[in-house]
Amino acid sequence: MRFQFKRRLSPRKRRHLRVRAKVFGTPERPRLNVFRSNKHIYAQIIDDTRGHTLVAASTLEKEVRERFPDPHPKIEEARIVGQVVGERALAKGITRVVFDRGGYKYHGRVKALADGARAAGLQF
């Protein structure tokens, strides 16, 4: 009776676990991870062999917020975050990444972030 109620993962978490089983970042080609909340979007470039975050950007940063046009829809915010993470990655010598959509559909803000990173010069 102790384990009568099985804890269930959300569908996004299950998809993310499936994706993470296949996507792995190396030093030559690290992983570009996306996390999307209702209000903000976050992007990290991660080297999974060492477990270190090499580059990060989010809509919470003042430097990123200053680039937002007025008014700024969330898709435009995501595109700018993608550009910033791409610029920071190129400054550190990272040109190729593996895109980890984090269990989200490749649509809307996630797609806009990926397009912004590609526009900045990242290849994936």
Swiss-Prot record:
Pfam families: Ribosomal_L18p. GO terms for cellular component: cytosolic large ribosomal subunit. One of its GO terms (molecular function) is structural constituent of ribosome. Keywords: Ribonucleoprotein, Ribosomal protein, RNA-binding, rRNA-binding. One of its GO terms (biological process) is translation. The keyword Acyltransferase does not apply. InterPro entries: Ribosomal_uL18_bac-type (IPR004389), Ribosomal_uL18_bac/euk (IPR005484). This is one of the proteins that bind and probably mediate the attachment of the 5S RNA into the large ribosomal subunit, where it forms part of the central protuberance. Part of the 50S ribosomal subunit; part of the 5S rRNA/L5/L18/L25 subcomplex. Contacts the 5S and 23S rRNAs. NCBIfam families: L18_bact. Belongs to the universal ribosomal protein uL18 family. This is Large ribosomal subunit protein uL18. It comes from Thermomicrobium roseum (strain ATCC 27502 / DSM 5159 / P-2). The gene is rplR.
